[in-house]
């Protein structure tokens, strides 16, 4: 079972200065880091926040509007996201949107490189098992659920009012009782309803909903039952995590009336789930949490351009403004007598490592991979099939497009937040 580690670490920025970060990392059973986020303790992330934004200008030839969510921050809004938008101020009844209009928007992508943050008018209210959407008013069900499960949820949820909102049933829903899912949907309904009622009392640039800290959001987005324990060595963070799970971090002892800190809690099992979650405050003066999980060395490896494979081959990752290029090198381990088998074996090993690195480093956008040339077409088919299987484990939408005539493999990975590399860039 995986564990989530949340700690502090000083990391060298690209200008060589050290800065303190909150490191939230997912580790597998073998204590291998498989996901990581770096957040400055004082960072105020915009991702997921809902604002009353004001339209600054509309550019029809790129089907976009530029919306201010604060006097200092302008965001990109695609006009394709305006269906069922909730306007608080509408200046034109004939045009879909004009400068001066005010509407509810949600930040769906952080500022990346030279691009402004992106917002959408299709608001999302995410729970553990379902997502309520204000613009897309249909019932969607996770593609990872089987036909029987999809049919069950269509029947179960037909009574919900999809004229006012849409629903997306997450993969995690299959791990809980129907009553738990329905209760969460009712809670999301109420949240959206209250926001619509209260917005008339708010002014432009008001923050209507503030997203949870990155380290809490990352944990919530893990598959149900995939994380057995959340561990931190920061008492303040531990108390925040406990409160997020509805647990007060201080408990009354049986022989006294003064609440005292407790270092570990078992999150009550939700009806219908088999696995529970342990919240742990770690404190050991002889061995820090960072040392126990080799956080610093794992991060150093995650920033290296070249990665060596067990076979002696290597992969090299290079970033450009437009895309990421990954090159697979065979090294000196090719045995001529078994050339075809060796080439396929090295490429399969590289494909597994590349899928791991994309998730670990949060590399997104267009990715071009130059595998070693294979000697048979059927081997190319095997490589692509296995690579797709490895990419399916990534919680972020990742698609293997195809292999080009030049033998380059095209992959796209959805852009949501900064890559690990961009986290170290100075603002």
Give the role of each language-model region.
Residues 1-120:
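Charged, low-complexity terminal tails
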Residues 133-144, 167-181, 199-206, 225-228, ...:
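Short hinge/gating elements
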Residues 52-54, 58-81, 96-107, 115, ...:
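N-terminal assembly/transducer modules of large multi-domain enzymes
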Residues 1-44, 49, 120-130, 139, ...:
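Extended, charged alpha/beta regions that create polyanion-binding interfaces
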Residues 6-10, 15, 26-29, 38-40, ...:
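Flexible glycine-/small-residue-rich
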Residues 95, 99-102, 203, 362-366:
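Loop/turn-to-beta-strand initiation segments
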Residues 75, 238-240, 247-253, 258, ...:
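Nucleotide-binding motor/catalytic cores of P-loop/tubulin-like NTPases across gene-expression machines
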Residues 63-67, 111-132, 188, 311-427:
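Conserved glycine-centered short motifs in functionally critical loops
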